[in-house]
């Protein structure tokens, strides 16, 4: 599969994610989301600092009318070239490694992931850890590397809105 096809697939996935985002936040179903709609929805969901997330989304309000349309949000995707998308993918991989690699060896062990979920009070950290390793430890050597994460992202539908990394 060529890199161009891969990035087109990512763009399509991003557009679907945007459509889902609009369905979730457009409380009055007028095809536009307001800053207040985003903040209120995030607050109801128990998110901390909903204004910060709304600020990030509203960078795409190109006409600065206080309403974000799906077309405005899609412009960001169009403006992203393949190089930028690859940079974002690599940043996500780096962030996942940095968030979970406790000993700095650039590999994530099962114990490191298990410790992370246990510290966060996950309901079943063993089950979550096993699931992550079944999917991402491609060579079954007990560690997850940057290359395995990149390969996992290539094979799976990549989503910018659904992080594969544990939440902080």
Swiss-Prot record:
Ordered alphabetically, the record's keywords are: Calcium, Metal-binding, Repeat
Q: Where does Ca(2+) 3 bind?
A: 101, 103, 105, 107, 112
Q: Which InterPro entries match?
A: EF-hand-dom_pair (IPR011992), EF_Hand_1_Ca_BS (IPR018247), EF_hand_dom (IPR002048)
Residue positions binding Ca(2+) 1: 26, 28, 30, 32, 37
Q: Where does Ca(2+) 4 bind?
A: 137, 139, 141, 148
Q: What is this protein called?
A: Calcium-binding protein 2
Pfam families attached to this UniProt entry: EF-hand_5 (PF13202), EF-hand_7 (PF13499)
EF-hand domain ranges (all copies): 13-48, 48-83, 88-123, 124-159
State the organism of origin. Answer: Dictyostelium discoideum
Provide the residue positions that the database annotates as binding Ca(2+) 2. 61, 63, 65, 67, 72
Give a short account of what the protein does: Not known; probably binds four calcium ions.
Higher taxonomy = Eukaryota, Amoebozoa, Evosea, Eumycetozoa, Dictyostelia
GO MF term (any one): calcium ion binding
